[in-house]
Amino acid sequence: MVNFTVDQIRAIMDKKANIRNMSVIAHVDHGKSTLTDSLVCKAGIIASARAGETRFTDTRKDEQERCITIKSTAISLFYELSENDLNFIKQSKDGAGFLINLIDSPGHVDFSSEVTAALRVTDGALVVVDCVSGVCVQTETVLRQAIAERIKPVLMMNKMDRALLELQLEPEELYQTFQRIVENVNVIISTYGEGESGPMGNIMIDPVLGTVGFGSGLHGWAFTLKQFAEMYVAKFAAKGEGQLGPAERAKKVEDMMKKLWGDRYFDPATGKFSKSASSPDGKKLPRTFCQLILDPIFKVFDAIMNFKKEETAKLIEKLDIKLDSEDKDKEGKPLLKAVMRRWLPAGDALLQMITIHLPSPVTAQKYRCELLYEGPPDDEAAMGIKSCDPKGPLMMYISKMVPTSDKGRFYAFGRVFSGLVSTGLKVRIMGPNYTPGKKEDLYLKPIQRTILMMGRYVEPIEDVPCGNIVGLVGVDQFLVKTGTITTFEHAHNMRVMKFSVSPVVRVAVEAKNPADLPKLVEGLKRLAKSDPMVQCIIEESGEHIIAGAGELHLEICLKDLEEDHACIPIKKSDPVVSYRETVSEESNVLCLSKSPNKHNRLYMKARPFPDGLAEDIDKGEVSARQELKQRARYLAEKYEWDVAEARKIWCFGPDGTGPNILTDITKGVQYLNEIKDSVVAGFQWATKEGALCEENMRGVRFDVHDVTLHADAIHRGGGQIIPTARRCLYASVLTAQPRLMEPIYLVEIQCPEQVVGGIYGVLNRKRGHVFEESQVAGTPMFVVKAYLPVNESFGFTADLRSNTGGQAFPQCVFDHWQILPGDPFDNTSRPSQVVAETRKRKGLKEGIPALDNFLDKL
């Protein structure tokens, strides 16, 4: 089955310049898994006849039934470049054999956390775009994530068979379509990238360089300009000069590639290339890309699909394609597949593009180190990562847990960035909350086994050097989802991954049979391990809550919980949306609270953030870890804060990083520093559980105006100050016109023109509003973009399909938080209903607590 043994893989692992770690990313249903098949069959794991139908990397039963990828799956491939191709590689190399660790990731937005986990352990990405529907929302989201992790993209235009057979495009129209997609992708890259002066250099994609592939995953054929340039160089060389050396040949091919794209034209009469669109005698010349590349492909398609027997035979002979005896009898589409697959095999084109243009760990870790490692840039660990040194200290990042066949145990899946990981090695296992020098979230344990991930199988292996992707056994008890594994005593953590979506939809679950409760709790623990994104929370009322990114994500999680993790029947509530609390103006009075012993007083006010600041904090533009003066300057310039106040930010909350700020604007208060920690603790508590219905607060700035304290330290301990600070914060929120915020999805709907009216109807019923509608150039499809409250999104897909006759395809991405119009104190308004429902669900007292509970009189 597999053409190479573990020992051969192990030998290549040491040649770190010849390793490529890459993931396949794209919009949902643009053909990632199908394309991955061509690569896998080239490296000898599926029989080539079945490629395109197997979807080898969809390992789960529900993935095969639904025809979608849910989890990202890793697989190692081995590929040898010919001597001629080696000359195209611009980085260091070591022999001709390459080890490609490929991760096929899901495209569905609900699983974009899986994509993040896949991107963290790879250095390059194959971005797949359907050339009929073009660049979609999810393409942009995953590409943006890739660029943020400093991952080099190459592009693949998939589904060319559709463009030729369904849309029947002319060569020039097809060229324009490709040109437009390349431009769109480059716009995204230049928007989020660091430019040519950045550490990665220029990462724009360009067909001339060979970083764009064209083809069809389903039919199993693909090419880059390099393949055609080679054919023509060979053809022209046969006419004239003798044999070329490999290096000269590579140079020739690279020159040829420049002529095959863009505004270059070919004169078939003279066989010369020209830069003007008309020949000297005034004839209109064809574009080289159309004449020399698309034309032969169109001819093959035309001859075979219109059953022109003689022409087909001629073409097959001319292109020098050897068909098997069984292939010779085929006709129509099966013959087309066989011919195209022999002439332009997808595996070769893509694997060459990957090995030539994607960086090896040696190249990539130089510029990715500063993003990956939290510690100082010059300690042993950082140096080991930068130089990808197998003799350095072990540094390994675990990006996710993979369930094993044995119930309840997990493989830890991740990548070795420095050093060597081996069976039985004693290591430090550090969770995300570990800080150097402290004991919490740190375990010293041996690794039981190291294994190779091979799609549906695992292979044991003795040890794995840096630059490779590996699974570990026996680490799963000590980590929840992600973590760092190291042998270096003073190592800091590898940075935690940033997810592009947040878990905003929740359901409560309980066991149908109360005796099964322990199994449910155990199952929830395993579920939290197996999915990078999901959150499992126990409410104070004893309810078990699961929070996910959307309906589909939750559905899959609950199915996993029931069938794999807890193995018991489960009851679930209707999905509930999490809200945020905020304020809409400044507090109308200065709020005073006294401590329980009446010796200390705090005075505070609350006010809303200027627009955009909360989003900046979410993105990390403004954060607690920034340098003080730099942060103050940013706030003063962009949001017109007073510089003196901006320098006296005490903290962010909840959890020290959230979108609320506590600033100290007191003047000359005694003992202030002694109670700072207590006030901060009260602030974290208050922002985590707001005054209205104990939801997180968002976008509130609290100012401490004045503090009067008892002179004796024993009377101003934490027990006196923390609850007082919390009461005072609540009072200042309640006097500042509190409001609720709800999460909003950005919905992108693709549909034919005639059903656009039906879409507007559904969106209006669901409180959605359309903000952009455009036609996809060159196709009859419309794209409608709208904002839709998450609360209204349940059953939205089904509703939309029934109103449009199943012709509209929605894609929902969490976009932003928006204030729910209405006053929560007015009993008839929507927010007051939400508050009442939430309080009831959480088992709190009915009604928003009165202001008198928090506000004291002098």
UniProtKB/Swiss-Prot annotation:
The keyword Lipid biosynthesis does not apply. The modification Phosphotyrosine is found at Y265, Y373. There is a cross-link at K239 (Glycyl lysine isopeptide (Lys-Gly) (interchain with G-Cter in SUMO1)). NCBIfam families: small_GTP. Pfam families: EFG_C, EFG_III, EFG_IV, GTP_EFTU, GTP_EFTU_D2. This is Elongation factor 2. Keywords: Acetylation, Cytoplasm, Elongation factor, GTP-binding, Hydrolase, Isopeptide bond, Methylation, Nucleotide-binding, Nucleus, Phosphoprotein, Protein biosynthesis, Ubl conjugation. The record marks E586, S587, K605, A606 as: Cleavage. It comes from Callithrix jacchus. Coiled coil: none annotated.
